[in-house]
Amino acid sequence: MAIHLPLEQPVILPPDPDDSAQQVAAALAAFQAGQSTASAYRGQLNAIAARYPTCLNAWAALGELALPDDVIAAYAFFRVGYHRGLDRARGSGWRGTQQLRWEDEGNRGFLRCLYGLMCAATAIGEEAEVTRIQQFLLELDPSNHFGLERL
């Protein structure tokens, strides 16, 4: 059963605190360039998440790094980011009916956490959760940034 959100003004989440998103991006760039190991990258992300527990991009990056090798850790990281994102969305006036689109950069950490949670739920066989998250993602961001199959 599809839930169809009424057309309301989309919500744009405020950015991650201070320069935490930039710190995450810099750590990722160094890791991708081979300038740091996975362990060092994880340590940087852990430090950012500890300093800025509301940094959605840090939780998303931690989950993405954990997949596919440590699905349970990934699931936990994404779940924390998802709940932190819901808190931020509600604090920004989101009432559960507006879109949170990928095109708005402030929303990307939350959407990455939600997508990652769906991927981790798939890996552990949580079919009902996968379906709910997929439907939720498509309703939040109709542009379908993640290329999900429409239900």
Task: Give the location of each predicted region.
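Solvent-exposed loop and edge beta-strand segments that line ligand/cofactor-binding
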Residues: 50, 101-106
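Structural register within alpha-helical repeat arrays
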Residues: 62, 110, 117-120
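Alpha-helix N-cap/N′ positions at the starts of helices
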Residues: 40-43, 109-113
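N-terminal alpha-helical interaction modules that lie
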Residues: 1-57, 61-94, 122-151
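Start-of-helix signal in alpha-solenoid helical-repeat scaffolds, especially tetratricopeptide repeats
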Residues: 56, 104-107, 111
